[in-house]
Amino acid sequence: EETFREKSDGPTVETREIKNEKNLSKIHFGDVFAVTYTGKLSVYTNGVNYNVPVRETLFDEGMDVVDFFKGLAPVLGDENKTLIVYGKKDFAYAVSDYGVEIKCKTQDVSLIKYLVDYTERKETFDDVIISKGYNPFTPAYDLFLLYDELYSVLVAQDMKSLYEKVELPLSDILYDMERYGFKADVPALKRLSAEYAAEAETLTKKIYELSGEVFNINSPKQLGEVLFGKMAIGKGKKNAGGYSTTAEVLEKYADRHEIIKYILRYRKVQKFKSTYVEGFLAVADKNTGLIHTRFNQTI
């Protein structure tokens, strides 16, 4: 049987269910409130945990996610309130999709946990509350407890300044960078792609000419057999898949045969073209040329 922990220095939390926008609007929010939005919609404030069933169909009781976030808009827009969430940046994405702006102060428990209880693995909020034995039926209250617990450790370890002056502001900066994106010069990238393609073709012909054989240059096995077998440019280093043809190995034989410099250049050109040039072109918005990436602050 699973056991769940309640706050040891306070009463068992009162739990209520919110099934519509009208009831949500009647919540009296204190100066501090916690919100969970992944898995279960839940709000905790003034000693009460409010669970919000998500309406899946027109006939279900509960609220749509959009109505939940819009119902929170007034308190999220109150600069005198403090919001506790697990993942400030992700929460900002979630509410902004519905036109809701966050102006209240925000505490990000995921960042605090990253600083004081780093585990080297990706953990969701649900993972954390289960591992700590919190009650999964009061998620927002659990979040409040987790904040209370970890923030005390943060202060004790003298990392409050790091959290408030570096990590929290950085989260906002990363969010803005992700939303605005990076401008890519698409025409220039396309020209560069064509130039690299032409150079790769020229290098391929030169390599075939010097080796006296047509083969797959991108195949380490075939390349090794040509260089160390047919051409015998050196003894080579064999492994289970054949001869090793890493850059480090090939550079040792650069003075043995001019084919090596062409192979090394061919690899660089292919790497630049496929990984960077084509990679950027694949993710750049076709209309704006902007590249929108995601930054993970807690790894």
Model-derived regions, located:
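Conserved "right-hand" nucleotidyltransferase catalytic core of DNA-directed polymerases
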Residues: 1-63, 67, 71-77, 81, ...
